[in-house]
């Protein structure tokens, strides 16, 4: 297992190097001049040129790149032009908000999609099977920002059941003492159940938006994988041996159907990292997605580069976790590693 993990980490290094190079080049190719934005609309050409020199943008591209990689090697992502704060600090402060939203959306999606896919596979052609197909089609068809706007319109504007979509907490509540950065967990640790209730109420709509978006591929893959396994010889043998239907489905069929589902979960999580950007803008969520969008609009290179690199590292770590889960579920993966 350790050998397999070491190999995966070695294979990830070229990918991260490629991400650093491509991100650097793409940010420099974006339209707009950070020096002009930072100087303001009334600045003269001399003032803009002076700021450009101060930011190092007058240097050759290769020199800028080596300076950037040297800073990265020391853990320095640079400073944001719009906030004046270190990018690493901004990302560290905002990442828990994005993580809490993404993880809750994924957990809700898994809790609905996997049982729905299993029921659809064990009852093909029934109403639950048709419900699964309709749900997956709707989840794939609806853009994530449209789903979010519809939920806000229905549950906040029309029905008044949801609080205003303006961040992680209601204005009348203060953040719990920071332990993990996740408000739900920190509020429980502090035994502040009012803050927990407020944080959960703010999370429901954006998490539901992500859950609807991610539910479709998980349910569809669960259904397809279960159908394939249920038609296999060892399942027919288990049924012929007189085992109960629940034992056959859960112990034999579902465990063997899990590998494709786990692969889908890794892809869905990566999709959610991208969809998070739109959801955070719709719900004014103070995560790294909205931070990256604001930096992109203002041609602020450092936050965009820091955001992309953070997402790449998270994706590499996610794939490593998936590989470890493969080894836990299927011993053949450990032997091949």
Residue ranges: model-predicted function:
Residues 15-66, 155-195:
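Hydrophobic alpha-helical transmembrane segments of membrane transport/permease proteins
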Residues 41-56, 147-160, 205-210, 247-264:
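Hydrophobic alpha-helical transmembrane segments
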Residues 2-3, 95-128, 144, 175-337:
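Alpha-helical transmembrane segments of integral membrane proteins
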Residues 58-114:
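An internal, D/E-rich "acidic patch" concept
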Residues 19, 23-27, 148, 152, ...:
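Juxtamembrane/transmembrane-helix interface segments of polytopic membrane transporters
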Residues 115-119, 128-182:
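Hydrophobic alpha-helical segments embedded in or immediately adjacent to the lipid bilayer
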Residues 3, 7, 40, 50-53, ...:
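Short amphipathic alpha-helical coupling elements at transmembrane boundaries
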Residues 1-60, 88, 92-93, 110, ...:
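N-terminal signal-anchor/first transmembrane alpha helix
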């Amino acid at each position: 297992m350790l050998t397999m993990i070491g190999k995966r980490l070695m294979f990830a290094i070229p990918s991260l190097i490629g991400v650093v190079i491509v991100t650097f080049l793409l940010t420099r190719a974006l339209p707009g001049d950070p020096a002009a934005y930072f100087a303001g609309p009334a600045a003269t050409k001399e003032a803009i040129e002076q700021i450009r020199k101060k930011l190092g943008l007058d240097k050759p591209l290769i020199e800028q790149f080596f300076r950037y990689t040297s800073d990265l090697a020391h853990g320095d992502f640079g400073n944001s032009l719009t906030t004046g704060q270190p990018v690493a600090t901004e990302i560290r402060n905002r990442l828990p908000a994005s993580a809490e939203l993404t993880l809750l959306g994924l957990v809700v999606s898994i809790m609905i999609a996997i049982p729905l896919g299993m029921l659809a596979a064990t009852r093909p052609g029934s109403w639950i099977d048709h419900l699964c197909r309709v749900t997956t089609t709707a989840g794939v068809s609806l853009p994530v920002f449209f789903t979010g706007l519809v939920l806000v319109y229905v549950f906040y504007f029309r029905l008044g059941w949801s609080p205003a979509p303006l961040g992680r907490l209601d204005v009348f509540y203060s953040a719990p003492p920071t332990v993990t950065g996740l408000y739900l967990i920190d509020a429980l640790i502090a035994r502040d159940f009012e803050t927990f209730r407020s944080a959960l109420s703010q999370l429901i709509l954006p998490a539901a938006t992500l859950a609807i978006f991610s539910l479709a591929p998980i349910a569809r893959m669960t259904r397809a994988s279960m159908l394939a396994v249920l038609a296999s010889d060892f399942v027919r043998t288990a049924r012929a041996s007189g085992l109960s239907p629940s034992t056959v489905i859960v112990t034999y069929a579902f465990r063997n159907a899990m590998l494709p589902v786990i692969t889908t979960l890794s892809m869905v999580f990566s999709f959610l990292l991208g969809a998070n950007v739109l959801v955070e803008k719709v719900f004014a969520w103070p995560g790294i997605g909205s931070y990256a969008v604001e930096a992109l609009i203002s041609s602020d290179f450092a936050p965009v580069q820091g955001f992309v690199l953070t997402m790449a590292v998270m994706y590499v770590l996610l794939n490593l976790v998936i590989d470890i889960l493969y080894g836990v579920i299927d011993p053949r993966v450990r032997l091949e590693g």
